[in-house]
């Protein structure tokens, strides 16, 4: 019976070590996810602050409304506005009329597809 007890004890130790290793791995991946989330939030805060300085309240409201339907387009335009402001190629603050013009220029590049039925 002592051999059987010894085998059980070893197996229990192995299982405990495996469980501990799994918990450590989960903890490491959880920490990594938290760091990534924190970095993403920090980036979003920096972007929001930059846009606050670049855009007038009316222009910010227009982007917020547009975000409801075309989030990818708004993200691209926001990044474009920030880059243009950093390169000093943009007159700050950007008014609603200027933003409308930028939106027209950005969206006019897309081709329209017409389907005619016979």
UniProtKB/Swiss-Prot annotation:
One of its GO terms (cellular component) is cytosol. Keywords: DNA-binding. Residues 15-44 have a biased composition (Low complexity). One of its GO terms (molecular function) is DNA binding. Residues 15-45 are annotated as: Disordered. It holds the Pfam family dsDNA_bind. Coiled coil: none annotated. NCBIfam families: PRK04239.1 (NF003268). Belongs to the PDCD5 family. PANTHER family: PROGRAMMED CELL DEATH PROTEIN 5. This is DNA-binding protein Msp_0595. It comes from Methanosphaera stadtmanae (strain ATCC 43021 / DSM 3091 / JCM 11832 / MCB-3). The lineage of its organism: Archaea, Methanobacteriati, Methanobacteriota, Methanomada group, Methanobacteria.
């Amino acid at each position: 019976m002592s051999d059987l007890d010894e085998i059980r004890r070893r197996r229990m130790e192995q299982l405990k070590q495996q469980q501990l290793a799994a918990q450590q791995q989960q903890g490491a991946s959880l920490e990594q996810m938290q760091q990534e989330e924190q970095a993403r939030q920090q980036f979003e805060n920096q972007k929001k602050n930059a846009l606050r300085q670049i855009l007038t309240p009316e222009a910010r409201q227009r982007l917020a409304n547009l975000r409801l339907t075309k989030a990818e387009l708004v993200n691209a335009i926001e990044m474009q506005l920030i880059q243009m402001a950093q390169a000093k190629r943009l007159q700050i603050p950007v008014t609603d009329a200027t933003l409308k013009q930028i939106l027209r220029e950005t969206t006019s590049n897309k081709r329209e597809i017409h389907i005619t039925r016979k």
